[in-house]
Amino acid sequence: MNVAAKYRMASLYVGDLHADVTEDLLFRKFSTVGPVLSIRICRDQVTRRSLGYAYVNFLQLADAQKALDTMNFDIIKGKSIRLMWSQRDAYLRRSGIGNVFIKNLDKSIDNKTLYEHFSAFGKILSSKVMSDDQGSKGYAFVHFQNQSAADRAIEEMNGKLLKGCKVFVGRFKNRKDREAELRSKASEFTNVYIKNFGGDMDDERLKDVFSKYGKTLSVKVMTDSSGKSKGFGFVSFDSHEAAKKAVEEMNGRDINGQLIFVGRAQKKVERQAELKQMFEQLKRERIRGCQGVKLYIKNLDDTIDDEKLRNEFSSFGSISRVKVMQEEGQSKGFGLICFSSPEDATKAMTEMNGRILGSKPLSIALAQRH
């Protein structure tokens, strides 16, 4: 092993540092366990303020191990520091091997408590409870040295009670895997969301409307405290084919003078994840040089032209281009809107998808680049 590699192995990451912690203070603390070669607090390039983490390089690997064993979660300037081996192997960090995701954590569980609960299953490379100014966000990550330790932790801890909360413990999924899972759910849905049908609808009538597309497992019109319809509801089919056919044939259909919206039903967490995924894609489009963020608008009423479409969407932000596609002077029923920022496009899509414009409910998606 060459000298540089040896010193890399004796390097520790020090996280969750107080903004006032200095290199001198860290040197005095860590040199009590053995000779320290160097310490670097990472700082903002412009303001030179601490970013809250540092790297400590020891002369001896054994001293780095001793510091990790005896100083992890020590208090410096009122904050508990978090130590782990400095991991310069990008593949190991990103591969997901040995990485575990934990959610539904009690707010009182901190980094130290998390480490204590999971270190019994194997050597931990890193662990962190995610938090903001209000404290714990209720989820965390633990990265084990190998997958077998991670599998033991999942088998033993998933569904167990920690501080009164039943926690979920599972394999960490990277963004590509999460996006693939979302696409799979979207392509195999069986639950349908219906809105805009007014206050006269009930469960039986809604079932009569949708049962012709396939066997229904449940039908529910949402009601207020007086039992009156809130104008939206859900139908659960026993097959994806039936649900898909219902969406295709009923979206935009007139029921008792009301143009209804019919689409895939999503849980709140799925909607949030899908919106977050779309927002990240929008940002990537901008980074790749797109002059704007394009939304594809379908199911346009024949009376909607460029000006009317712009007027309907202008409240969401700066629009650089609007185009309703036409053939021989007649609308083809779809168009494009180019916003100047991902934030504006995301807001427009969230607010306007399914909204009645003219006589039809809009269908909005991110315009794909080819």
UniProtKB/Swiss-Prot annotation:
Pfam families: RRM_1. Transmembrane segments: none annotated. The keyword RNA-binding applies. The keyword Hydrolase does not apply. GO terms for cellular component: cytoplasmic stress granule; cytosol; nucleus; ribonucleoprotein complex. InterPro entries: Nucleotide-bd_a/b_plait_sf, PABP_1234, PABP_RRM1, RBD_domain_sf, RRM2_I_PABPs, RRM_dom, RRM_dom_euk. GO terms for molecular function: mRNA 3'-UTR binding; poly(A) binding; poly(U) RNA binding. Residues 10-88, 98-174, 190-267, 293-369 form the RRM domain. PROSITE patterns: RRM. Disulfide bonds: none annotated. Keywords: Repeat, RNA-binding. May bind RNA. Belongs to the polyadenylate-binding protein type-1 family. This is Polyadenylate-binding protein 4-like. The lineage of its organism: Eukaryota, Metazoa, Chordata, Craniata, Vertebrata. The gene is PABPC4L.
